[in-house]
Amino acid sequence: MVHLTAEEKAAVTALWGKVDVEDVGGEALGRLLVVYPWTQRFFDSFGDLSTPAAVMSNAKVKAHGKKVLNAFSDGMAHLDNLKGTFAKLSELHCDKLHVDPENFRLLGNVLVCVLAHHFGKEFTPQVQAAYQKVVAGVATALAHKYH
């Protein structure tokens, strides 16, 4: 559960309605793989990830980024039940994929950077603060199975 004021909830949902999940998702996942290259080990089947340009133009990275943000959209629709919303993904990432849960926090922070880049002045410090709460809540929900 994320504790947002009514104003924060309105701000994050209004902005999220404008997000192009394909564009933002691909950029966010791509940036994660470039900025934190050790995360690439989970994407061996994605082909060429040898340079930042290769990562950012990789069709599989873009497609998976879209998939990630579609799941994030589910969370945005259920901010009062993130643990339940992400229970199956938490189990998958813990039991089958063995993803370090710290990576969820890293991706959340990268997503905030990408949103700031895409929305510029509309992404005010207040909106950023609200999104930081949301991505922290999603990261906690995804890490739930690890505890």
Swiss-Prot record:
GO terms for biological process: hydrogen peroxide catabolic process. SUPFAM superfamilies: Globin-like. The modification Phosphoserine is found at S45. The keyword Transferase does not apply. The modification Phosphothreonine is found at T13. It comes from the Eukaryota. InterPro entries: Globin, Globin-like_sf, Globin/Proto, Hemoglobin_b, Hemoglobin_oxygen_transport. The modification N-acetylvaline is found at V2. Red blood cells. The modification S-nitrosocysteine is found at C94. This is Hemoglobin subunit beta. It comes from Carlito syrichta.
